[in-house]
Amino acid sequence: MKDKIVIAGYGAVGQAHEYLLERFSFKIQVVDPNYYKKTWRDVGFNGKVFDYNPQAVIICVSTPQNTDGSCNIDNVVDVLNDVLKPVPVMIKSTLSIEGWRKITAMFSHLDITYSPEYLRQENAIQDFEFSKEISLGGGDIAYWDKLWKYCCKKVIIREPEELILGKSFRNAFLATKVNFFNQVYDMCKACNIDFEQVRQEVTN
């Protein structure tokens, strides 16, 4: 596979995908209004998805919280509006179930796949390079399965809404875990007890 792929969004996730896919000789075009500022590369002009006639699109744009706590999908919708022909699309951006349902209803003519990301911002490239698995669901499974296996990843296939809810609960669990051990640390400090020894007793 040597397809031309557009990556929309050049934050940590977009950069990690660009790095890995270019290593496997895919032709990558980034669409991001701040791309030049982030890389100092001369891109000629600030194009949109349809300008590059890609074989596939990976969406890594931000989905910030609205004031009511819901997931704002406007950036994802903006990218999808620029996909003018039915090519495989993979969304890596964080979505809610409601957001996913709205997107798939609005763009029912597109093959849209969802794939959650669990990369740490400060180590995104290394995390993605050395991860062994990638989960995905919906859309053109056959295309993405072939692509990621070509990049030496084990592909786990689930329903998109299972993946969305799984990521949400995983993040909640990790936050609870951090809060739990913060309380353990405070208790150890108050009692003048070695926190690291207690932590090992809890986790081993």
Where are these regions (language model features)?
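Structural/interface elements that position substrates and couple domains in central-metabolism enzymes
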Residues: 1-204
